[in-house]
Amino acid sequence: MSKLIEYDETARRAMEAGVDKLAETVRVTLGPRGRHVVLAKSFGGPTVTNDGVTVARDIDLEDPFENLGAQLVKSVATKTNDVAGDGTTTATVLARALVKTGLRLVAAGINPIALGSGIGKAADAVSEALLASATPVSGKDAIAQVATVSSRDQLIGDLVGEAMSKVGHDGVVSVEESSTLGTELEFTEGVGFDKGYLSAYFVTDFDAQQAVLEDPLILLHQDKISSLPDLLPLLEKVAESGKPLMIIAEDIEGEALATLVVNSIRKTLKAIAVKSPYFGDRRKAFLQDLAAVTGAEVVNPDAGLVLREVGLEVMGSARRVVVSKDDTIIVDGGGAPEAVEARVNLLRSEIDRSDSEWDREKLGERLAKLAGGVAVIKVGAATETELKKRKESVEDAVAAAKAAVEEGIVAGGGSALIQARNALKDLRASLSGDEAVGVDVFSEALAAPLYWIATNAGLDGSVVVNKVSEVPAGHGLNAATLTYGDLAADGIVDPVKVTRSAVLNASSVARMVLTTETAIVDKPAEPEDDGHGHHGHAH
């Protein structure tokens, strides 16, 4: 296919226009008084959302060069969402501010490599300063506070706080749609682990990029599965049962994986294949944990259980399985409570007997997964559109709460970034030339999130930024009440992990745009003339 090429300033300006269009669309959602964006869907009703990454994912621009810029900033939002689960709009407006000011300076003759280096060093310094100023989070109320800020809903915040305090920091919180109008919390037997689906073709919920199976049969296999003849007899029995299938094994590859994928695409058998976590003996032990939770028997050729000879009697079950690209959650496993209890007691005694600190830590992880169970937040609403929006809010709140527990919190509302400018003074003094200018560019960009939070609340962004620059650390604008004060006392806090991810990802993509010298895109296909054009014929 033939290509279109743009060079130098023309390429960078086109990309900047794309960055601007995406950021301008996303920034309206920022802050407690942020607005909604309505997304038309090719099927079903429109989606109404104030979630930055949902808006960003939906944007593709007509001009291919502008679209390059938009896709780069979209990657900032997506990456921040993947790492921290929130902070996508903050990352987007930071990236836009860096690109806008940076390109103006590059056009004026500043060296883009040195400028980018200064921006990178400034981002690292701010990231370290945010970590150093973090307040640890523990306890139901503190977690609820973070979740409330993320979701802008006290009820959701309280539910997430209760869920996290019950299942523990490493526990699993699953979000489901409910058929009722209310949102409620329940605790069930279940387990989660850090492995995702082996093929994106297993995905059933394309918006959330998750594979979800209701009432599946679960096969646990100790070794690799690659041979189709070995797997086929069992697949046929599962297909006859009419239930979906989940396979957890050391690996699933070759013909076996290809067959599962083809069946999923054709919808002849809904299936998901997942690698079992850990290595060696720890993997074998964790499969036994899963066997207790699901009621399955681990298929192990060493113990005389051969895959091609087993039937449905070795299969476990669960009410629901949710698998993303990185995580698996098994909700309401079909195993007997006594079996889970026995497994928990065994793990506790192993922890007591172990001399190795590392072994004790890993056994403790498994114990937390087993004993904690799964907290399920069931989200209900009056309409399909409202339900989707509310479910998104709950998922963001859970992600924010987990991020807060991991690295602590700082004052929210964009003020932590304004106050992090102090960390750049020493760095600025130690650099010279265009690198030092990069630090100045970054310092100026740190005001962007607060500026837009204030603007969306109907205030003058520049005035608010100047005022917050002068208040004590931890103080700032509460955009919900339009007052200034101690933000932590008002419950306006952000997880450090979210803010740091936004800073580092925005800096990374801005440096890419600033140092771009050539942009190459596919030439758009000319619309075909089918010979039926209107040539002024009289009818």
Curated annotation (Swiss-Prot):
Family annotation (Pfam families): Cpn60_TCP1
Organism, as annotated: Mycobacterium ulcerans (strain Agy99)
Keyword Protein transport in annotation: no
Enzyme Commission number(s): 5.6.1.7
Keyword Isomerase: yes
CDD domains noted in UniProt: GroEL (cd03344)
Major localization class: cytoplasm
Protein name per its UniProtKB record: Chaperonin GroEL 1
